[in-house]
Amino acid sequence: MVSSNFYKNLGPRKLTAIIDFLHDIIEPTKIHEDIDIHDIKILQEASPNDISFLSNPKYSEFLKTTKAAACIVPKDFTEESNQNTVLIHAENSYFAYSKLIDFFYAPIKSYSTKIMKSAIIADSAAIGKNCYIGHNVVIEDDVIIGDNSIIDAGTFIGRGVNIGKNARIEQHVSINYAIIGDDVVILVGAKIGQDGFGFATEKGVHNKIFHIGIVKIGNNVEIGSNTTIDRGALQDTIIEDLCRIDNLVQIGHGVKIGKGSIIVAQAGIAGSSAIGKYCALGGQVGIAGHLNIGDRTQVAAQGGVAQNIEEGKIVGGSPAVPIMDWHRQSIIMKQLVKTSNNKLKK
């Protein structure tokens, strides 16, 4: 249930208006009646004035009984459905749903062009036009913040940091030694630009290595809550354009993340490894240091990568192996356990 405490419903919307809004990502759709659509709901909860979506075939059975006025479905969907539900076919129904959410809802909380009195901003800092600077924000010397940016309460931005236009930086974020592009979102509690875990050991003494690199983050990047991105020791840590990084991810010093890559929660990437473009790392994946992971690589959840991976490979397990080998290993292990248990019973 969508709470009106936090989100504003922009509806009702005419069904024809919805179809027109999504026209470039859906198939042409004919309707018999142009009704008001009040909300977006899951198939099981939708009423005759709601729209829904289907992206996971596990839920296709609910299309037979749903009361939804309309439903966005995959392009090739041909299964039985409620005759009263208008089916809107899309190449990617989940992507269409993500666009529809923007058409129906907006956050209640809004940010005016304002600098709160409790914010501490150095005289040499340059704040762009139409920015919001929240309570207890600290912005140090020579910081540059682009136009239309939001810096929310309790955030710290260290000396010399450069942040592009249209940034949204949420509460209690800290940013040091970083250059950040346009249209970047950094969620609550993320830490960027701190020292990496670098020590030189001699006779039991761990001598800390002074890190003189920075963090470079491209355009249209999202970084999740409590994620940490260390600055480089010599080489910079680089996050290229269009990356999506989930909560609680650790990115070590000197790591490079290629354009459009996705990294899911609790993954960790050790120092100086390079992740290619459009890669996907599942939850709790671990990448050892000084490795090269090819473009469009996928690593299944909890995979442990200890060697280089060629472009386009799908791997899983720890140590990570080709995904089909991992499945075979899992089957063999189950068979061994079953055989062993049978012998013990005898």
Curated annotation (Swiss-Prot):
It is an enzyme of class 2 (transferase). Keywords: Acyltransferase, Lipid A biosynthesis, Lipid biosynthesis, Lipid metabolism, Repeat, Transferase. GO terms for molecular function: N-acyltransferase activity. Its EC number is 2.3.1.191. It catalyses: a UDP-3-O-[(3R)-3-hydroxyacyl]-alpha-D-glucosamine + a (3R)-hydroxyacyl-[ACP] = a UDP-2-N,3-O-bis[(3R)-3-hydroxyacyl]-alpha-D-glucosamine + holo-[ACP] + H(+). Pfam families: Hexapep (PF00132), LpxD (PF04613). Gene3D superfamilies: Hexapeptide repeat proteins, MurE/MurF, N-terminal domain. GO terms for biological process: lipid A biosynthetic process. CDD domains: LbH_LpxD. InterPro entries: Hexapep (IPR001451), Hexapep_transf_CS (IPR018357), LpxD (IPR007691), Trimer_LpxA-like_sf (IPR011004), UDP_GlcNAc_AcTrfase_non-rep (IPR020573). PANTHER family: UDP-3-O-ACYLGLUCOSAMINE N-ACYLTRANSFERASE, UDP-3-O-ACYLGLUCOSAMINE N-ACYLTRANSFERASE 1, MITOCHONDRIAL-RELATED. This is UDP-3-O-acylglucosamine N-acyltransferase. It comes from Rickettsia typhi (strain ATCC VR-144 / Wilmington). The lineage of its organism: Bacteria, Pseudomonadati, Pseudomonadota, Alphaproteobacteria, Rickettsiales.
